[in-house]
């Protein structure tokens, strides 16, 4: 099974699910196609095809592909009960259900195509496709707030993708004198092998546009404006895949271009730019936590913080920092998506996302309440969770490079920790408020993620360590 499989399954899903209005059948088919994509990604661990004109699979993008398709599958599983409840209470209709499931598969199709692509132009098109899918799903409720969030996402995302397109074009122009015209000058494999000969002035300008353009998709400060609204107003499964997956895909694009700069002796150093944007994102998000009143907005800002940590790590560079960045990306994706699984059911039960109205969850709904406690403690970076391990490694590598930068990052992490604990106490403990009626829930996706995050904090298999170390070398 080749990279084409993880692209083919969601493509078939788009065509089929757009024709099915039964939510029971369509939700199971959505889960089935997502599962098949995940199985296809597992096969890539054991058999990697040689690079072709359009597809490239190496140890680096397999990390992203596997993570994307695992969380894509578990989120589809979570969506079954969540979307069924939205249908039952009249928030969604059968036509919108067809749209939701076909767009969900379009999102997976776009992300997988971007990650498997051996062409800088095809990557750009794929990320734009994935973005448009989520833009449409954010506005699926057709409320004033959701349409406004969707429009804001579309405008800011459009600006970002336009800048990324211009940056991509500059890299293509820089490669033509050495590689030649056409698709050859757009292939990652050719660009990697000729990186030292690319026009450094064009490459430098191009990377600035790439960083700003794709950085908008990552949600880095000050390009984050779309992210809190999109998380708060869209369906919770989309919040989970936005935070857990799509932000990673945009960061992957930045990292691929960063590798090209690292191999060019005359190009600028991309690391300090990425470090600065990452640190600014952490500090900004940490301060904004204290003012949040909506629980989904709170964790949207948490995503800004953690994408900042990941960017900071890759900006610092070196074997340890790159390893820590990959580990933190994996832990954040698993933890944050699981938190949104819990929040999705909680908001349906309580019929609100206001933090002030969600108190006493550990008493009224112990499974969800304590699950949220676990998730918040994990995402806050407390031991023995995997996030603690990755943050410790990021700080260690930063202290070795620049104690001042490490101290600034530590201040941001401690500030964020205090805010999250404060909000956790408000939500999980105290006198229960609001509706406590049970709804049909599926906890397997949430607890499977938490189990992996806990296990990674206790023991990482040597094979995984070796894999991430090889990826760290690719990232230089």
Swiss-Prot record:
GO terms for biological process: ATP synthesis coupled electron transport. It is found in: Cell inner membrane. InterPro entries: ComplexI-like_HydComp, NADH_UbQ_OxRdtase, ND/Mrp_TM. It is a multi-pass membrane protein. It comes from the Bacteria. Keywords: Cell inner membrane, Cell membrane, Membrane, Oxidoreductase, Transmembrane, Transmembrane helix. One of its GO terms (cellular component) is plasma membrane. Belongs to the complex I subunit 5 family. Its main location: membrane. Its EC number is 1.-.-.-. The lineage of its organism: Bacteria, Pseudomonadati, Verrucomicrobiota, Methylacidiphilae, Methylacidiphilales. This is Hydrogenase-4 component F homolog. The keyword Transferase does not apply. The gene is hyfF. GO terms for molecular function: NADH dehydrogenase (ubiquinone) activity. The chain crosses the membrane at residues 1-21, 25-45, 54-74, 120-140, 153-173, 202-222, 235-255, 270-290, 307-327, 368-388, 402-422, 442-462. It is an enzyme of class 1 (oxidoreductase).
């Amino acid at each position: 099974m080749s990279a084409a499989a993880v692209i083919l399954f969601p493509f078939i899903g788009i065509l089929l699910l757009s024709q099915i209005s039964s939510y029971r059948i369509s939700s199971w088919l959505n889960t089935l196609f997502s599962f098949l994509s995940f199985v296809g990604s597992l096969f890539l661990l054991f058999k990697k095809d040689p690079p072709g004109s359009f597809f490239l699979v190496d140890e680096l993008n397999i990390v992203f592909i596997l993570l994307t398709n695992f969380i894509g599958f578990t989120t589809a599983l979570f969506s079954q009960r969540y979307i069924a409840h939205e249908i039952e209470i009249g928030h969604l209709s059968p036509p919108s259900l067809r749209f939701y499931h076909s767009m969900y598969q379009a999102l997976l199709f776009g992300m997988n195509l971007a990650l498997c692509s051996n062409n800088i132009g095809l990557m750009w098109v794929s990320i734009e496709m994935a973005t448009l899918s989520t833009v449409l799903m954010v506005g699926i409720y057709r409320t004033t707030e959701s349409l406004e969030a969707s429009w804001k996402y579309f405008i800011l995302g459009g600006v970002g993708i336009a800048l990324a397109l211009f940056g991509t074009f500059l890299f293509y122009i820089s490669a033509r004198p050495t590689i030649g015209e056409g698709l050859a000058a757009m292939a990652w494999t050719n660009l990697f092998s000729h990186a030292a000969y690319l026009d450094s002035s064009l490459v430098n300008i191009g990377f600035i546009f790439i960083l700003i353009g794709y950085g908008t998709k990552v949600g880095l400060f000050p390009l984050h404006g779309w992210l809190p609204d999109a998380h708060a107003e869209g369906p919770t499964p989309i919040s989970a895949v936005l935070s857990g997956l799509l932000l990673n895909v945009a960061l992957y694009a930045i990292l691929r271009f960063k590798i090209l700069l690292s191999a060019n002796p005359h190009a600028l150093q991309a690391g300090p730019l990425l470090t600065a944007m990452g640190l600014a994102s952490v500090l900004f998000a940490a301060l904004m936590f204290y003012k949040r009143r909506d629980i989904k907005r709170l964790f949207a800002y948490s995503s800004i913080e953690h994408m900042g940590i990941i960017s900071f790590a890759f900006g610092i560079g070196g074997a340890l920092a790159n390893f820590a960045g990959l580990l933190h990306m994996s832990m954040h994706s698993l933890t944050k998506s699981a938190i949104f699984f819990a929040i999705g059911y909680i908001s349906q039960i309580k019929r609100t996302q206001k933090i002030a109205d969600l108190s006493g969850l550990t008493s009224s709904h112990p499974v969800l309440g304590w699950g949220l406690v676990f998730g918040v403690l994990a995402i806050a970076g407390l031991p023995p969770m995997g996030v603690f391990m990755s943050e410790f490694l990021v700080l260690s590598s930063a202290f070795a490079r620049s104690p001042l930068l490490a101290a600034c990052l530590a201040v941001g992490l401690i500030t964020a920790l205090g805010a999250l604990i404060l909000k956790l106490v408000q939500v999980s403990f105290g006198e229960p408020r609001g509706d406590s009626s049970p709804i049909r829930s599926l906890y397997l996706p949430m607890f499977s993620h938490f189990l992996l995050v806990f296990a990674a904090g206790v023991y990482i298999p040597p094979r995984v360590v070796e894999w991430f170390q090889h990826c760290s070398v690719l990232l230089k």
